[in-house]
């Protein structure tokens, strides 16, 4: 075999080795993203099952988020959150998954707005365990106007109901009542 053919074979072998290594790495990344997506799905299913024990089992390592997410689950349950659409999860990187969920609820219903809110859960997942969760929402401006109105005009509705960390049901129901009063007392066309 000539030196030229040996060189070509060596180069082809090296290229094949490099390409195969790259594919293995991509498969590992894909498996990690699939795993994170599965973990996110398990969390969302537990949250909207309104079963506290199921939710807690997904929050074992989310020490800083656990209490607020359990409170929020109870708020959502008592506010009659109904999932309208589970949007595609957004894999931001190897540890952050965004889970946008569109819901219909009593709060927006009390404001008589034809709008469904999308709540987004920002899950940080490391080593296949949820480490923290943050939430965001696209609540309309009217939602915040109504909350502000309650604070200034009917504080007695929510002060006691919302003072504790274990009163999510009382708080959301009082807020809905306040939103109804806000709507009845506000003559502005929405």
Model-predicted regions and their roles:
Residues 1-31:
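Bacterial Sec-dependent N-terminal signal peptides
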Residues 112-141:
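Mature extracytoplasmic domains of secretory-pathway proteins
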Residues 43-65:
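Short, well-ordered alpha-helical segments enriched in acidic and aromatic residues
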Residues 59, 101-105, 136-139:
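A mature extracytoplasmic/lumenal domain signature
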Residues 73-122:
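Surface-exposed, charged secondary-structure patches
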